[in-house]
Amino acid sequence: MASTRSIELEHFEERDKRPRPGSRRGAPSSSGGSSSSGPKGNGLIPSPAHSAHCSFYRTRTLQALSSEKKAKKARFYRNGDRYFKGLVFAISSDRFRSFDALLMELTRSLSDNVNLPQGVRTIYTIDGSRKVTSLDELLEGESYVCASNEPFRKVDYTKNINPNWSVNIKGGTARALAAPSSVKSEVKESKDFIKPKLVTVIRSGVKPRKAVRILLNKKTAHSFEQVLTDITEAIKLDSGVVKRLCTLDGKQVTCLQDFFGDDDVFIACGPEKFRYAQDDFVLDHSECRVLKSSYSRSSAVKYSGSKSPGPSRRSKSPASVKRGGHHASAYSAARSPVNGTPSSQLSTPKSTKSSSSSPTSPGSFRGLKQISAHGRSSSNVNGGPELARCLSPEGVNGNRCSESSTLLEKYKIGKVIGDGNFAVVKECMDRSTGKEFALKIIDKAKCCGKEHLIENEVSILRRVKHPNIIMLVEEMETATELFLVMELVKGGDLFDAITSSTKYTERDGSAMVYNLANALRYLHGLSIVHRDIKPENLLVCEYPDGTKSLKLGDFGLATVVEGPLYTVCGTPTYVAPEIIAETGYGLKVDIWAAGVITYILLCGFPPFRSENNLQEDLFDQILAGKLEFPAPYWDNITDSAKELISQMLQVNVEARCTAGEILSHPWVSDDASQENNMQAEVTGKLKQHFNNALPKQNSTTTGVSVIMNTALDKEGQIFCSKHCQDSSRPGMELTSPVPPSASAEEPPVSAPAAAPAPLESPTPPGTPAASGCERAGTWRRHRD
């Protein structure tokens, strides 16, 4: 500011010293005197606008100014990703003040746990000849490649630049350039189904529910993704963006044409893990009455083709109805007590799919044709003829699939025990040994464009084999589906082990921590970080001799650590401070989550929580790392346990202990824990603070839900951090201190559940027999 003023003063001093040769316009010049021509001769000082210094600004026309402000459009690709079609960014000085700001935005848009896990750090030209180091080097209409710290990978990135919007277009840049008119006509024909239509979208959650009316026509419905964006802006879900739309019959909307069918009312759900309750698809009498009056008023303009450019018009009615309202649903769920949604868990909602998939739904798996999903229908619960046809030796289109034939020969396939967004789980029994497993069937057509996420998860499962980790027994593949034979754990999760037992001591908690630390030491030895350690992913395995152990599952967010990671993901209650701070993190984020779990095991509530259910408050507490052991809940807990928790919950990553140090700590290894029964106290607090700690009717469903999840279900858990959270951007919603409803798998019941009898689950291969000191009902401590 001071330099600017000094320049202005120097300018005026120069004007005083050197008068302009000409006087005011229309005044005659004087040959001999300077009294009339000089600026001071007539006592007038010319305006700065007339000075030579300001003549520069007069030459900059409005056209020049507008061209300077105009945004440059450029397309960005991921380094080495030949299946990514690129993302177009509008780059302007107003949007990006610096080159680092552009890198940060590209990281949020292009980075995930497989591609660019360390964020975007380098931008190459499309041919890799040079690096881009400033915003001025980016040119209008050019393409660039984003990388972390790795060298440029030479791939023909522009090969798949034109997406196949129509199933009749075979794609390819060459054909698009050769016959643009034909492609354009085909695209136009594919949208002939679009007619002006007024639809009602109801937000999921507790009643009364907000509803909005949206006009769909050729001006407002360009693509399915664009309509979802408009619905997100209109309905404003508490949990962020709208990820899923269903009709009142429970059928999922998968493409743009589904909006123009017989259905007029849709249910909108966000990225939270949510299983639909039966009454979510049923409108009460007041909602039907309000909707009827609303539609009677709007029927005259329903097909008039409004000229308003806006995509939606809000309705003050709480809900809407569909054709008089006959809706049936067989879905059941446990809904979070806060706003009716399990907000903290950020997985894609679990919905039961319709038995017939939409014929207009686009889908391909690396060029393979899509076929209808098998085994989804409720009439085929035993996996009979349909599964046999799916796994028949003839395969698909007459091609033999020896893998599927081998699968049927080796295993007896039973009924469906779990149905998720991208996978279905069936009972599976080894014909030779009689051991029970879970068969996870992933539909490749539903993973189109995101196959790398599934491949990453499966590649990690192939590598790990440990008694405290749910094991991938076998994998097989056909042209349309991926089959994973998984270890089936029937004992429920960590909370079930506490709430369903008659006695729970500090020693039991110590054994649970030992099991978890044992699994983490193994994973970290392979440089694998789990990133989603929480009680819902820790399943209880009960052995024939009555002993128990924990098994870690759900590797959807797991990845191999080759350097600092920057993807902000996880579950708020268990997320480490370095993830929130976005300073880069590694293996020890799992240790922090284990420390939070250890704290909960001994008192029943988390160490960091927001009394006002605000995510910002929770993150501030985690970043501060102020750990307290309030009385009277911690009065009877040993100092050794408190010491270990303090070492695990160190904000300083270097000071935080490792998994090996946890195993060697006296509280874990030397039986420094007490035998006092604290089952009633801990169970009471768990039921108060965690909705998934309520007793379940069937503990097997907990293990099935963990197996049913895929890496694609985890996309919603990559969230906006504390630094980028605002009211207009979807972020991670918090239910504090209630963590995620990992378990909205079973509806809560009021009657207390009896302690389950030990299950005759088979002992996994390689599991050592229980030592003599491990009596029935105690926890096993597997020694590596």
Curated annotation (Swiss-Prot):
EC number: 2.7.11.1
Residues of the Protein kinase domain: 411-668
GO BP annotations listed: intracellular signal transduction
Domain Doublecortin per the UniProt entry, residue ranges: 72-158, 197-280
Keyword Oxidoreductase set for record: no
GO cellular component, one term: cytoskeleton
Record text about domains: The doublecortin domains are involved in the colocalization with microtubules.
Pfam families tied to this protein: DCX, Pkinase
An example molecular function term from Gene Ontology annotations: protein serine kinase activity
Record's protein name: Serine/threonine-protein kinase DCLK2
Region (Disordered): 1-45, 300-368, 724-784
Residues found modified as Phosphoserine: 379, 664
